[in-house]
Each structure stands twice: as C-alpha cells, then as structure tokens.
C-alpha cells in the first residue's frame, strides 16, 4: 500500500517532467518506427523535423532513440539549440557524428534567433553535407521559418496524450519508481481516482495536452500538505483536491482587473455550456471569445483584446494556444500563442 508519506517522498520521480530524473520510456511505437526509418534514409543535407507542442516528449523520444542506438549520435551528447546555433555557428563543428540534433526551435526563443539559427544550420548543411534532426513546437510550421530549411521531411507519427497513453505512463512510473510499495495486484485506480485521470486527458485536448502540464499539476497537489498530509494514511488522489487547489491558487500572472473580469465570464460560460469540458470539439477563435467578452460587458476594444486579455491568460496557463506561432511583419511582434484557444486543464478543473 502506498501511503501519503511514501507518495510525497517519491512525487518528484513519479511525476517528473524534466531530465532531472531518468524516467523509463513508454509507448510511441509508431513514432519510433517512422523515426528510425526516416533517420536511416536521411541523405547529406537533409533534415528531419519534429514539430509538436512544448512538454509532449519530443526530446525524450530522441534521447531514447540515441540510447537504443537507433540514431548514430553518442549517448549523453548535449544537443544544439536554435539560439546557440544563431549566436555561435561554430558549435555545429563540435557536434559529434554526422547527424546534428538542434533542439528548442520554439516560442521560448526570439523569432530573430529562430530564423537566424535555422539559416545558419542550412548554410552549414550545404557546406558539410551532414544531416540534422530539428526539434521544435508548431513554430516550425511557420512558413518563413520553415523555408529556412530546404531539404526537409516531417515526423508525422507522434502519439498524442490520450487517456490510454496517460494511464500507461502513470502505471509504469509507479511500478518503476515505487516497486516496493505496491501490492501484488496493484492497479492505477488504487492511487488515483479514475475520474481524475479522465479529466487530465480530455479527448478534445490530446493534440496539445502535455506531460509537463499534467505532471506539474500532480506534483503541486501532492507536495501541498493541505491536500496530501505527511502521514501513513493510504494515498489517494481525488478530483476534489485539484479543484480546491486551483480555486485557492494565487499564482495567476494577471495584472489587470479586466483580465480577471473576463476570466470570470469565461469560467461561467464553460461551467454552463461545457460542464466538465463536455461538448468542446475545437478551439475558440478570437472573434468567438470577443463576442463572449461583449456579452459579459467587458470594457475592451477588439484590436486590443488578444494582446491585453487573451495573451496574458495563455501565459498564465489558463488558455492553450492551438495555432501556429508566427511573426507579424506590420507590428514587428512574434505572436507566440495565437488562436484558436482551448481551456487549459488548470482552467477546466477550476470550474469543475
């Protein structure tokens, strides 16, 4: 039996979402097969692109392929980054092997460094005739950035974080990190309410749902003594704990009253029209959300609405962008989190 004390002691490992702990690899059989085939057939100067949302396991997949010797790159190699390749192109000369791995081609990097890094990569490939694997978010689908790389192909198979995938990963994590605490007939529902698992992996969110988002939320609740006390009671995570935690969360990075006003309107709308997220099939456009703001008598102009209200909500992990980040030539801005938007798990659980 896993106690609260046991779970708190092991929460960083069981719910890890970074390279701090070496978690076992799970699933992604289709991704592995396609990636192995495409990597093996890469010709000099060609690039394999992996374009998926942040925190979904792209780098983890590549590291797994390297550790299994399915990619000809030495283990524990430090991957290049878009920023690093932009600022110091000579780093590419130092990367071991004939396949460069360039990571973090995503919204954490400025657009100028993204395009600069990819242009430098293409120039290097032209001269060296080496190959490359480029790892990034949907920024890689931006036409201007995409055009920086000439001979490219995209990894099309990348298993999404649906309910079955999440259950499999969680069960494996408990068995790997806490084997001495498990009963012989252990099942995941012994520790986590099935309804909570369902809530953390809605079908309509699987294209943008991330391990980082799910596991960081699980860590936060388990680490809080208010919801999981450091005692020998049987550990059991219920959806009510997460609802209360998010209702009490004071970490929202909102600094304008109008942002809170719209958040309240949005919460009521989701609660009444999409209880527990049921009925959501796609993201909301700026027009749809602005219409909701008008119905709620929110004082904001359409031209300011996205920048002043929607973007801060996305940064605060209340809305999740499903669009393609792009550079607005007229405004000179990198639009990192464009519409359509779907409610985040954080937002959904707060209106449960």
Model feature map: region roles:
Residues 92-149:
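Conserved Walker B catalytic segment
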Residues 1-45:
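A short, basic N-terminal segment
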Residues 204-222:
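The conserved phosphate-sensing helix
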Residues 156-197:
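Conserved small helical "lid"/interfacial subdomain of P-loop NTPases
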Residues 218-296:
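Winged-helix-like regulatory helical subdomains adjacent to P-loop NTPase cores
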